[in-house]
């Protein structure tokens, strides 16, 4: 392979040199990356997952039939024919993300074994966070089915992309209220009554009672654990507890994730002084993750730089499959 000679490829900031990794060793194991990736995922295990591994193509078509109805049968009259125009959900596989490091030979000779663990965990976490962020972004399609994967979930967030996406907040005076930007103040905190109202909206949408989950930001954990109906995960049976699971309320499992999106930052919120984050009440079929290539690890020796190029990558797509099965509760991050 021809040597890479561009200055942008090899700069002090783009490589792991002796100074940056003086106490590590560059052994990267693919299975460790996969383990770290799976451990870091929070949203992905709670939504519908499809595997396209080994299959060609870039679009998945999922049939989405319309529910039929029962009709009264009259004597000597033909049955009622139902001819619904069925629809489908399409998932475009176009999310390709990578994590790369260029590791110099001198580091391999002089470093300690913990570098491998650091890089594998870092790669797994970075890729898992990207997948979770995209699933959270797909929540902008709750209600309508039309979502935006470019909406920011950190930094400057105005909140406008989340309006109308089955998004609510608990108004301190009026209870559960549809969210619009510049409305949430520090007093609009989570309440048990507000959560029950949100559950009722999901019930009214004819969403199955099973396979529901509530994914919350860390700031909401204390309020959830203080509700009368909270049941700690410590009191479950001997089954393995999933990552992030802290308990349940009204039979709905509660998961804590630091990846819960920033809906509106404090600077953009003209009426409040705190960031506004989104907690997701979802049914498993509300969102779908399709993986055409799970986490893959590759290495290539770059002789011209006496270094090893390590890359981990993944290829996937996301979609709002049953948009009526997802709701977002905006809470002040206090």
Please describe what each predicted stretch is.
Residues 47-52, 199-201:
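Short, charged/polar N-terminal "headpieces" of proteins
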Residues 182, 186-228:
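Hydrophobic, aromatic-enriched interface-forming segments
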Residues 2-46, 53, 63-67, 87-93, ...:
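Sequence/fold signature of self-assembling virion shell proteins
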Residues 56-87:
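N-terminal low-complexity, intrinsically disordered segments
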Residues 141, 219-223, 260-262:
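Short, catalytically relevant binding-site loops at active-site mouths
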Residues 74-78, 206, 250-256:
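Glycine-centered small-residue hotspots that permit tight backbone geometry or close packing
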Residues 59-64, 86-152, 203-218, 254, ...:
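Long, contiguous amphipathic alpha-helices that act as assembly "spine/axial" helices in icosahedral shell
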Residues 106-200, 328-334:
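Alpha-helical scaffold segments that mediate packing/assembly in large oligomeric complexes
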